[in-house]
Amino acid sequence: MRVTDFSFDLPDELIARYPMAQRNASRLLTLDGNTGTLADKQFTDLLGMINPGDLMVFNNTRVIPARLFGQKASGGKLEILVERMLDDKRILAHVRSSKSPKVDSIIHLDGGYEMKMAARHDALFELELLSDLTILEVLEAVGHMPLPPYIDRPDEDADKERYQTVYNQNPGAVAAPTAGLHFDDAMLEALKAKGVNIAFVTLHVGAGTFQPVRVDNVLEHKMHSEWANVPQDVVDLIVQTKAAGKRVVAVGTTSVRSLESAARASEGELKAFSGDTDIFIYPGYQFQIVDAMITNFHLPESTLIMLVSAFAGFDHVMAAYQHAITQKYRFFSYGDAMFVTKKAH
């Protein structure tokens, strides 16, 4: 398959630059993977689509304020975007400046903090914090929310809350698992009251999620790697859910990738998983765990639209996107959502 197969023209005004006033006020496009049938709904209608005994799996990563501003010793300005935290003092990061900082040079951050440029790894820089504080403490003090490039505005105070799920727990992501942004506490409680089981995995979304695919042939793409954790209690719930003939519903592509990574690492019987994953899901992939998914509308030619196409069928998904454009759905991180059921292979 060609990467350009996943292209579509999106009018600029359909890119959501701000979230809805209420989290669950978004629209929801449902797609039946088997038939391609579409239905226009409200996000709150999801309550009627998830059945008692179904298992919903959420990604509880917490977005860190991963964008830092500062200057080199020469006075040249630079911008740092954390890709991942290596430990309490060291980060792997993208650095934007007129000239790349040299190894062992000192970077002066806003707020008076200093970092040393420790090493370079291809396009990424390893930076070490020179302070008694931890990286997380410095990010919380002077970091900015790493809004995706297409939101195309400076971050605001409201983004600290709204570019974050209500159930976030484990700091480490530099992009939000956006399907989860639509859920508020009341909706989660309503799902539980209905008899729906709720479980949490962690995948720290990296900035690589916004990198364009730079090859023509889908098969040649090298996926970025991210840290994920699927604990044993979630594995047990999945096994029970499947045994009862109920569905595993993944909230977001990151939850899908976490669960399918666990399946890929297990031979035969599903096991807990913790570690880096570079799983790349594109049409032809056989899903082992996920039966339905909730996801936002993704960028053209992105690995995320490829994943959804693998799940519900390429033709069905591309037709759904054209429908969404015609019906003026809001796209990307702060936009509307889809509820998609799996196409039988």
Swiss-Prot record:
Gene3D superfamilies: QueA-like. This is S-adenosylmethionine:tRNA ribosyltransferase-isomerase. It holds the Pfam family Queuosine_synth. One of its GO terms (molecular function) is S-adenosylmethionine:tRNA ribosyltransferase-isomerase activity. Transfers and isomerizes the ribose moiety from AdoMet to the 7-aminomethyl group of 7-deazaguanine (preQ1-tRNA) to give epoxyqueuosine (oQ-tRNA). Belongs to the QueA family. It is an enzyme of class 2 (transferase). GO terms for biological process: queuosine biosynthetic process; tRNA wobble guanine modification. Its EC number is 2.4.99.17. The gene is queA. It is found in: Cytoplasm. GO terms for cellular component: cytoplasm. It comes from Shewanella sp. (strain MR-7). NCBIfam families: PRK00147.1, queA. Keywords: Cytoplasm, Queuosine biosynthesis, S-adenosyl-L-methionine, Transferase. It catalyses: 7-aminomethyl-7-carbaguanosine(34) in tRNA + S-adenosyl-L-methionine = epoxyqueuosine(34) in tRNA + adenine + L-methionine + 2 H(+). Its main location: cytoplasm. Monomer. Pathway: tRNA modification; tRNA-queuosine biosynthesis.
